[in-house]
């Protein structure tokens, strides 16, 4: 395993997006021209104090007013390293305790990273929440039978579940977890290959379901890049 004490951590804030989708990057949004110019959302919205946006603006898009948690965002510490041909990504976070209790009876907590490719529109700019959730179950006007988009091959979902039944993982992927007080650490390990190789910037996102949340009732990140082998990226996968 990598020596995490020698690897710098990048803090990424995850937020409860409510029922918002790609309308945040439409022409009515003041930052639309910046997105069209190829700049990511974090250029404007990420600050040293976390995400800079008004959480109350999410409320009108939330059909269930009681679903909005008191804690609308929280930080996740992200580290990455390449060791012996394997990419390791480590998430460390303190899940909020005031989220509305969800419907997942089997898992109190879930954490996931999504590794995206160019098939997902706006992946490297805004993050997967702008592209994947507009017509899914739980969204206003969404299809109750439509779940994840994994089968389309547009992104790779690496998920950890706190319950007794482990999440299904792609071949060559392992996950480990630990807990220190109220802080949870999850480490994903994936063999290099396919779209995830040295020299490539891999767009990725984070999703965390807290307090037995299910479906879209999760906290998500904006779009970031994982720089492997010195490639450009907000999170660098250092070689050990």
Curated annotation (Swiss-Prot):
Keywords: Electron transport, Heme, Iron, Metal-binding, Repeat, Transport. One of its GO terms (molecular function) is metal ion binding. Heme c 1 binds at residues 41, 44-45. InterPro entries: Cyt-c552/DMSO_Rdtase_haem-bd (IPR019020). The keyword Heme applies. Binds 2 heme c groups per subunit. Heme c 2 binds at residues 128, 132-133. SMART domains: EB_dh. The second heme binding site has an unusual CXXXCH motif. This is Cytochrome c-551. The lineage of its organism: Bacteria, Pseudomonadati, Pseudomonadota, Betaproteobacteria, Rhodocyclales.
């Amino acid at each position: 395993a990598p020596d995490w004490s020698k690897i710098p951590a990048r803090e990424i804030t995850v937020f409860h997006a409510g029922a918002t989708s790609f309308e945040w990057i439409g022409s009515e949004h003041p930052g639309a021209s910046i997105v069209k110019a190829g700049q990511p959302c974090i250029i404007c919205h990420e600050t040293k104090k976390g995400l800079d946006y008004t959480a109350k603006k999410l409320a009108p898009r939330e059909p269930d007013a009681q679903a909005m948690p008191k804690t609308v965002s929280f930080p996740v510490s992200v580290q990455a390293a390449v060791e012996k041909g394997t990419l390791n990504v480590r998430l460390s976070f303190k899940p909020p305790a005031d989220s509305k209790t969800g419907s997942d009876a089997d898992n109190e907590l879930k954490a996931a990273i999504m590794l995206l490719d160019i098939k997902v529109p706006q992946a490297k700019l805004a993050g997967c929440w702008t592209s994947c959730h507009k017509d899914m179950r739980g969204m206003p006007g969404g299809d109750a039978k439509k779940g994840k988009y994994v089968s389309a091959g547009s992104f790779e979902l690496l998920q950890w579940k706190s319950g007794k039944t482990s999440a299904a993982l792609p071949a060559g992927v392992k996950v480990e977890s630990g807990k220190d007080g109220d802080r949870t650490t999850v480490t994903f390990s994936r063999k290099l290959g396919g779209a995830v190789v040295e020299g490539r910037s891999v767009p990725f996102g984070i999703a965390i379901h807290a307090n037995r949340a299910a479906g879209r009732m999760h906290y998500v990140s904006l779009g970031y890049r994982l720089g492997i082998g010195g490639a450009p990226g907000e999170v660098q996968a250092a070689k050990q």
